[in-house]
């Protein structure tokens, strides 16, 4: 039997890695390189990250339908092509700002004061908003296309594991980002960091064009592998298989409780991942005076996502082990696994207290919150892989990309609320020196957000379980 399905997973993994590398460039360059040049504060950055989240959310709704309409191969090509253009557009934001305000260099922008500095901050922020919008529009297609490709190439029992592997690309992207992006920005300028990382997407497109095809048409898939891929179809009649493959309307997708359960899971938890992805570098700088361009900063971020990568892949394997051992249906096994994963983010509650308690360690005290955050993030990725797989468990194949898009929109909205709220809270906390649970200033703001992140998964699981308490396949 051929094993081309794992080559497909490798390509999905590579695309997701590039996806997250492109997103990470801003979070790893704004505080040290972009902020001084454009006179930004946390509110400006919070506006940009929240806009990305909401535009990504809106785009997800249409990206799912677009992938269903175009098909997996063409839909993915368009998606990564657009987001690669968006990634490269960030590099011209500085030039655009210089042209608008009539200054000739980055040094002149950074040296500006008064009203001119305010104009620079505003114009540059809007330039980045445009670039982030194009990036979000393209990146919205990644998960609908990847989940659809997984459903095309894997039987139900293997989908969570396959999803956990390509979903680990998010962690790998975040893992290599601090090792590559800050040095690129430091030695070649932050603009080149955006350009070089953006070009990777165009390289991936060349492989996808020549390698991917529907498994029935693929010259790389033999009869034995095709039978393995389509083993679930033997459980249905020929007429039922035809209905499963039919495209399902957007309105019809909204009528399924299974859709709303997925929406609830995404809304409650996606923002947690984005918060740690976007704000951890800034948190380390604010709390411990550690910059991502220095050795300790790179080591901390690298370790965080190394732990996430290793642990999250095993999280995708857990439902398969439960199914094989107990004979539970896929949905029940996933929900049991997700409940286990939902308890691990509670460790994030200890990040701030322990980080402050061991302050005698100096900047090395940062290792404590980083390790706790990494465990919470690993639990998120394991949770996410299983959450995505619930779609294929209960919904027809013709609805998978659409429902993935709907859930992605919900996750983006939840993320936008958390990112914007966090940015405003941190700015307010710093300005007013607010106190909360023994913390003062920005540390108080971080502790509030950490509390929200810690409980999000248990709340999300409870809502999902109440909407779909038992395994029920949608019939058309």
Residue ranges of model-derived segments:
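Residue-level signature of mid-helix packing/kink "hotspots" within the transmembrane helices
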Residues: 24, 53-61, 140, 174-175, ...
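Helix-loop-helix hairpin linking two adjacent transmembrane segments in secondary transporters
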Residues: 170-219
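Extracytoplasmic gate region of multi-pass secondary transporters
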Residues: 26-28, 254-313, 353, 380-384, ...
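C-terminal ends and interior cores of transmembrane alpha-helices
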Residues: 81-121, 339-362
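Extracytoplasmic
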Residues: 7-42, 97, 276-281
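Cytoplasmic helix-loop-helix junction between adjacent transmembrane helices
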Residues: 127, 131-171
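Multi-pass alpha-helical transporter architecture, strongest
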Residues: 204-212, 348-356, 446-476
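Primarily marks hydrophobic transmembrane alpha-helices of the MFS/SLC 12-helix fold
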Residues: 76, 128, 335-338
């Amino acid at each position: 039997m051929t094993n081309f399905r794992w080559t497909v997973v490798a390509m999905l993994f590579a695309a997701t890695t590039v996806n997250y590398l492109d997103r990470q460039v801003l979070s790893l360059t704004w505080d040290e390189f972009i902020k001084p040049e454009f006179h930004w504060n946390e509110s400006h950055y919070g506006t940009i990250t929240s806009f990305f989240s909401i535009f990504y959310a809106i785009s997800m709704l249409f990206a799912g339908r677009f992938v269903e309409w175009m098909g997996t191969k063409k839909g993915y090509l368009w998606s990564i092509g657009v987001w690669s253009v968006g990634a490269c557009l960030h590099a011209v934001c500085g030039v655009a700002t210089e042209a608008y305000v009539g200054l000739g260099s980055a040094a002149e922008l950074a040296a500006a004061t008064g009203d001119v500095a305010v104009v620079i901050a505003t114009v540059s922020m809007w330039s980045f908003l445009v670039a982030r919008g194009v990036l979000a529009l393209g990146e919205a297609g990644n998960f609908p296309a990847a989940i659809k490709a997984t459903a095309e190439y894997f039987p139900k029992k293997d989908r969570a594991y396959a999803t956990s592997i390509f979903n680990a690309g998010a962690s790998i992207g975040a893992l290599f980002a601090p090792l590559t992006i800050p040095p690129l920005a430091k030695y070649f300028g932050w603009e080149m960091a955006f350009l070089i990382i953006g070009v990777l997407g165009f390289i991936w497109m060349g492989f996808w064009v020549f390698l991917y095809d529907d498994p029935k048409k693929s010259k790389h898939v033999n009869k034995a592998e095709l039978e393995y891929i389509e083993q679930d179809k033997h459980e249905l009649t020929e007429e039922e298989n035809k209905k499963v493959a039919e495209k399902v309307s957007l309105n019809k997708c909204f009528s399924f409780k299974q859709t709303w359960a997925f929406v609830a899971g995404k809304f409650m938890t996606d923002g947690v991942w984005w918060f740690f992805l976007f704000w951890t570098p800034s948190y380390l700088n604010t709390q411990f005076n550690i910059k991502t361009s220095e050795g300790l900063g790179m080591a901390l971020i690298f370790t965080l996502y190394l732990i996430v990568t290793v642990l999250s892949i095993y999280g995708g394997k857990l439902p398969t082990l439960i199914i094989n051992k107990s004979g539970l249906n896929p949905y029940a096994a996933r929900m049991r696994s997700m409940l286990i994963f939902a308890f691990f983010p509670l460790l994030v509650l200890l990040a701030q207290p322990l980080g402050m308690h061991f302050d005698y360690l100096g900047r090395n005290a940062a290792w404590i919150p980083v390790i706790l955050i990494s465990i919470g993030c690993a639990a998120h990725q394991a949770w996410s892989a299983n959450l995505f797989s619930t779609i294929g468990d209960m919904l027809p194949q013709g609805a998978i990309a659409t429902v993935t898009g709907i859930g992605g929109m919900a996750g983006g909205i939840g993320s936008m609320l958390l990112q914007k709220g966090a940015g405003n809270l941190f700015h307010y906390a710093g300005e007013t020196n607010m106190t909360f649970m023994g913390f003062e200033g920005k540390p108080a703001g971080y502790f509030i957000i950490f509390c929200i992140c810690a409980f999000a998964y248990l709340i999300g699981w409870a809502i999902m379980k109440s909407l779909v308490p038992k395994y029920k396949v949608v019939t058309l």
